[in-house]
Amino acid sequence: MKNSDNKKVITMFKHNNTSATIMSVADSFDMRRGGKLNELDMAYETWGKLNQNKSNVVVVFTGLSPSSHIASSEKDKTPGWWDSMVGSNKAIDTGKYFVICINTLGSCFGSTSPVSINKKTSMPYRVSFPALTIEDMANASHLLIKKLGINKIKVLVGPSMGGMQALAYSVLHNKSVENIILISTATQALPFAIAVRSLQREVIRKDPLWKTGFYSYEEPPLNGVRIARKLGMTSYRSSVEWIQRFGRKKTTGAIINQNLFGIDNTNFEYEIESYLEHQAVKFQNIFDANCYLYLSRAMDWFDLAEHGDSTINALSKTNIKKALVLGVKTDTLFPIQQQKEIFEGLSQAETQVTFKTLNSLQGHDSFLVDTEIFSTEVKDFFDSL
């Protein structure tokens, strides 16, 4: 490892989450599958004002790839990843609620992760980072929330992997959550999702620059991360959308050597190829490979049924008053049947549940790109509280 790595790893991702506050929440943190962290830092951002009795708290857990910058703020005017959902007079109204978005444990945007410095070794954790689970994420978030002096969450919001964390949080810390919004998520990973993520991890590990996780931060395995992102994109969106959006359109100006299968090509032949490349290159430059591996595997491992012998029994441990469960028909990564199962389980737990199947062509990413239909449902839910 190069001598510059120690200093570089501390700052390399900060430019992607400059508005986050990083708080030390524990001197040590035991992980569910063994091992411990020698210090636990959590990154978060807030919007709105906390009322006097602290009864207006909304907490948002993110999916795998976003930072805590969910919306623009006075500190950072850059639009957030859910800017159309969160803000004054928006579905999650920062004029009424104190909104906290937490960067997930294991992510490279401020919270303790494989890129963090292990104080005992003065080196980045890298793959010496203990095995990470969704439950670890939930427990770390709970420590942060307690550190902020908050005992009760008015509404807990979780899309995708964030929904898994929200479910775990509601079971493990069941006196802390009043209401919940779960979007395009599940109580466990299905074979298709596990297969896709296993391939993503494999291409990262097969990148020669990965070096069994001890790569130089000056020469990270960008190619592996780039291809992994492309694989992910094929599961995040729907084939129906891509037929309408791209069809068989070809790019302009591409010089194609057919016998080299793209080795010397100056561009991609089809627009869909160019689109995937554009999205993947953006991602490879902002996300750490080891963090991706840990977060991806945590999703595969998650099974809420482990907390009650069955999903129904696990959900019966929650104390949620009202819940909103949303999904879309075109989601292949978290099929709509999985949201229906959450609805049925929470209903048996005597939670007042609203379940909606929304029509969107954008697949799993619908909640990020087709936000108008989601915003309507989320706003109606908040208005009902």
Regions found by a protein language model. Give the residues of each.
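Catalytic-loop region of hydrolases
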Residues: 2-60, 74
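N-terminal cap/lid subdomain of alpha/beta-hydrolase-fold enzymes
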Residues: 45, 49-118
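Conserved acidic catalytic loop of the alpha/beta-hydrolase fold
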Residues: 122-124, 128, 135-155
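Alpha/beta-hydrolase-fold enzymes
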Residues: 176, 182-282
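Short alpha-helix in the alpha/beta-hydrolase fold that links the catalytic acid
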Residues: 307-312, 322, 335-345
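Short beta-strand/loop motif that positions the catalytic acidic residue
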Residues: 325-327
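Catalytic active-site module of serine/aspartate enzymes centered on a nucleophile-bearing elbow/loop
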Residues: 341-344, 349-385
